[in-house]
C-alpha cells in the first residue's frame, strides 16, 4: 500500500495523483462514504478481462445508524422521486450505461482522454464519463460488481449534499452541457415553477394552486407506497417534507450554479 499526498485536497486532484503513480493496467476508484463487497475487485477485473475498458455496477444506499430518522432518510435517498436518476443506482441486467459509481478503468484510457478535470467540483464522474463516451469507449454495467454508498446521516448534511450537487451541475453545464441528462435538471424546473407561481400571484393563484395540488398528490402517493412497502415508523410521515426539501435544495443549487456559471465559464477558459 502506497499513501500519496493530495495537496489540492479535492477528489479529482487526488485521483489524478493516483493515476500518475499507478503501475498496473487498471485504475479502480473507491470513494469514502462507501462500502465495497468481498468480490468487488475480482468482479471488476473479470469484466475488464472480457474485453471492456470501463465497468461498474449497482450501488444501493445503506445507513450507518439504525435510528428511525436515518431509515427514513435512506428511503428518501432510495426513492426514484427523491434522488438518483442515474442508471448505476438501480440493479438491472448487464448493459452499457452513461455513468457508473466507483468504476474500474483501463489505465490506457487516460493516455487518450487525459486526466480528470480538476475545475469541475463535485461532478468529476459526469465529466470523466462524458469524455470517455465522447472518445468512443463504452461503460459496462454488471450486477456482479456491487458496492454500497452511505446515506448522509442528518437532514442538514443531506440537504447540503443535494445543494452542492445541483450547484456544480448548473455551473459545469456551461462547459460540459452533454455531461448531464435532462433528468439532472428536473429539480431546477421545479424551482422555476415555484418562482413563476409566486410571481404570478398578484394576477392569478391558478399556477400556485395547480403546482401545490400536483406536487402534493405525488409526494403523498410516494409516501403511502413507501409506508406500505416498509416497516412503519413515525418519521416516515416526514417524507413529503423531506422530498420537498431535497428537490428544492437540489434545484436551488442548480439555479445558483447556472447563474454563476456565466462568469465561471470565462475564468475556466482563461486558465
Show the residue positions of the predicted features.
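Glycine-rich, basic loop-to-helix element that forms the pyrophosphate-binding segment
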Residues: 6-22, 43, 100
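Conserved nucleotide-sugar donor-binding
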Residues: 23-24, 102-113
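Short aromatic/hydrophobic "clamp" motif used to bind/position activated sugar donors
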Residues: 27
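The conserved acidic donor/metal-binding loop of glycosyltransferases
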Residues: 31-35
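Conserved donor NDP-sugar-binding/catalytic core segment of glycosyltransferases
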Residues: 39-71, 146
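Short, flexible, basic/aromatic active-site loop/helix in glycosyltransferases
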Residues: 57-63, 73-96, 100-102, 111, ...
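Catalytic donor/gating beta->alpha subdomain of glycosyltransferases that bind UDP-sugars
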Residues: 63, 111, 117-180
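Active-site-adjacent helix/loop segment of glycosyltransferases
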Residues: 148-246, 252-256, 260, 268-271
Amino acid at each position: 500500500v502506497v499513501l500519496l499526498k493530495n495537496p489540492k485536497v479535492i477528489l479529482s486532484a487526488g485521483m489524478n495523483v493516483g493515476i500518475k503513480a499507478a503501475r498496473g493496467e487498471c485504475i479502480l476508484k473507491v470513494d469514502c462514504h462507501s462500502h465495497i463487497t468481498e468480490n468487488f475487485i475480482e468482479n471488476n477485473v473479470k469484466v475488464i478481462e472480457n474485453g471492456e475498458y470501463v465497468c461498474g455496477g449497482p450501488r444501493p444506499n445503506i445507513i450507518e445508524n439504525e435510528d428511525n430518522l436515518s431509515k427514513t432518510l435512506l428511503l428518501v435517498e432510495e426513492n426514484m422521486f427523491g434522488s438518483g436518476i442515474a442508471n448505476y443506482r438501480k440493479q438491472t441486467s448487464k448493459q452499457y450505461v452513461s455513468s457508473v459509481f466507483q468504476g474500474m478503468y483501463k489505465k490506457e484510457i487516460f493516455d487518450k482522454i487525459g486526466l480528470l478535470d480538476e475545475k469541475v467540483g463535485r461532478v468529476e464522474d459526469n465529466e470523466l464519463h462524458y469524455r470517455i463516451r465522447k472518445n468512443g469507449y463504452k461503460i459496462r454495467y454488471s450486477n456482479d460488481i456491487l458496492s454500497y454508498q452511505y446515506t448522509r446521516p442528518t437532514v442538514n448534511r443531506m440537504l447540503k449534499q443535494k445543494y452542492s450537487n445541483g450547484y456544480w451541475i448548473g455551473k459545469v453545464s456551461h462547459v460540459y452541457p452533454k455531461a448531464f441528462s435532462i433528468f439532472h435538471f428536473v429539480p431546477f424546473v421545479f424551482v422555476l415553477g415555484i418562482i413563476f407561481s409566486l410571481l404570478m400571484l398578484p394576477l392569478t393563484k391558478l399556477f400556485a394552486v395547480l403546482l401545490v395540488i400536483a406536487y402534493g398528490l405525488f409526494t403523498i402517493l410516494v409516501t403511502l407506497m413507501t409506508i406500505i412497502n416498509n416497516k412503519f415508523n413515525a418519521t416516515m410521515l416526514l417524507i413529503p417534507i423531506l422530498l420537498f426539501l431535497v428537490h428544492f435544495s437540489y434545484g436551488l443549487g442548480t439555479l445558483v450554479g447556472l447563474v454563476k456559471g456565466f462568469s465561471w465559464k470565462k475564468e475556466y477558459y482563461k486558465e
